């Protein structure tokens, strides 16, 4: 069954006064975003040399672990240089297939575990390159009250905003945590949201491949029919931000 996204107007009572003006600004920004970044050449912007170099540097700074192939960030660089054109061509013609992510469980303070999906370095670079371009498309559309995982935004700024609201007379704050959000993310819903701003079907198909790439756990590859691995930049960006 096809999932449809419906907004929830009035959910944030504190922002109800500014909602109308914000919605009008969203409408304008959406049109501009489509003209600027949602055209049929979005994949070429993702595969631009400068964007890919920036993506690799970001992956390197993060010092992440190796994926299922056991290749580290430093070891991947010579391969990327040697096979660059072959890799880019396979992405362009749609033959590229992402590798399954490596499952890793991180203990949580409450005694549970947080499941991470660690992609290979090559896939991390590609996903980071995608995420960088998705960020430029969606950033103008996000609520001004959103502070999580955004450039030049921080938890400290969110706390400061709560203090300002308290000084204005507001007395209640709500803390919400969605249980197993990334583990149960609906792929069809996510792709519908992406399609609203992206017309380059090659990009949509590539993101969907990452969602469906599977998980390797104890040497066994399992299909991923729902959920988004916490570890890949592109699917993590989409999972965190698009349902706003």
Which role does the model predict for each range below?
Residues 1-79:
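Non-catalytic, polymerase-adjacent accessory regions of viral genome-replication enzymes
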Residues 90-105, 109, 141-244:
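Conserved polymerase palm-domain catalytic core
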Residues 110-128:
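Glycine-rich active-site/cofactor-binding loop and its immediate structural neighborhood
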Residues 127-146:
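Electropositive, glycine- and tryptophan-enriched low-complexity nucleic-acid-binding patches
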């Amino acid at each position: 069954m096809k999932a449809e996204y419906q907004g929830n107007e009035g959910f944030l009572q504190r922002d109800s006064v500014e909602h109308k003006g914000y919605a009008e600004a969203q409408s304008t920004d959406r049109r501009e975003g489509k003209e600027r970044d949602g055209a049929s050449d979005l994949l070429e912007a993702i595969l631009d040399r400068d964007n890919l170099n920036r993506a690799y540097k970001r992956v390197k700074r993060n010092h992440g672990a190796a994926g299922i192939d056991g290749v580290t960030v430093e070891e991947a660089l010579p391969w990327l240089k040697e096979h660059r054109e072959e890799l880019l061509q396979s992405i362009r013609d749609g033959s590229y297939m992402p590798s399954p992510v490596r499952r890793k469980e991180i203990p949580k303070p409450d005694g549970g575990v947080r499941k991470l999906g660690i992609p290979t370095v090559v896939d991390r670079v590609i996903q980071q390159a995608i995420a960088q371009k998705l960020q430029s498309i969606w950033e103008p559309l996000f609520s001004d009250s959103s502070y999580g995982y955004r450039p030049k935004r921080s938890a400290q700024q969110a706390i400061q905003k709560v203090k300002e609201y308290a000084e204005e007379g507001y007395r209640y704050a709500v803390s919400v945590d969605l249980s197993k959000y990334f583990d149960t993310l609906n792929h069809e819903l996510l792709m519908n949201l992406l399609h609203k701003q992206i017309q380059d079907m090659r990009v949509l198909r590539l993101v969907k491949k990452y969602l469906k790439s599977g998980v390797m756990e104890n040497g066994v590859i399992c299909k991923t029919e729902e959920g988004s691995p916490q570890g890949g930049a592109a699917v993590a960006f989409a999972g965190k931000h698009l349902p706003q």
